[in-house]
Amino acid sequence: HIPKSTISSDGSKMMKSLANNLKKKIFSQDSAIMELTRVIKANKAGLSESNKPIGSFVFAGPSGVGKTELSKELAKLLGIAFIKFDMSEYMEPHSISRLIGAPAGYVGFEQGGLLVDAVRKSPYCVLLLDEIEKAHSDIYNILLQILDSASLTDNLGNRADFKNVIIIMTSNAGSKDSNTLGFNAALQHKND
């Protein structure tokens, strides 16, 4: 659930104006903003599943449309931590193990998983998995566990609880094929 500080009288006013405050900072993303705020308000009202993260979202589109910025502003307005993982750093199968810790006998075994440690340190957070399509497909096994049970355990037995986490994944996949607006559209038709 959302932290108690956000539920105070000032926090209630902030929750009512969350969508408008986000729209002041992020332009042309009204549907994403409305869906985010709807899910957060439902969670605050106790209308969401208690064994799942607050919400999980995929923001897809070309670079520069505000996917990452919306995530940052959301965390800022809610007064919670913003944790970002650049998924291009997890393209190899062995690199995925850094998120949950290396298996016994491998370098880094004595360290916990980066993702588990980050969420344990900041249990109320917006977790951004940036450019999710670049990560090795093994990431989806980890995500399935997080989205299904809102928990993840690293190689040392440390358990992170994702019940108070808003998970946002961004993707540029398919954005080159999408319709373009303005001058780019005119240039594209001219070149065809």
Give residue spans per PLM region.
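AAA+ P-loop NTPase nucleotide-binding core of proteostasis motors
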Residues: H1-D192
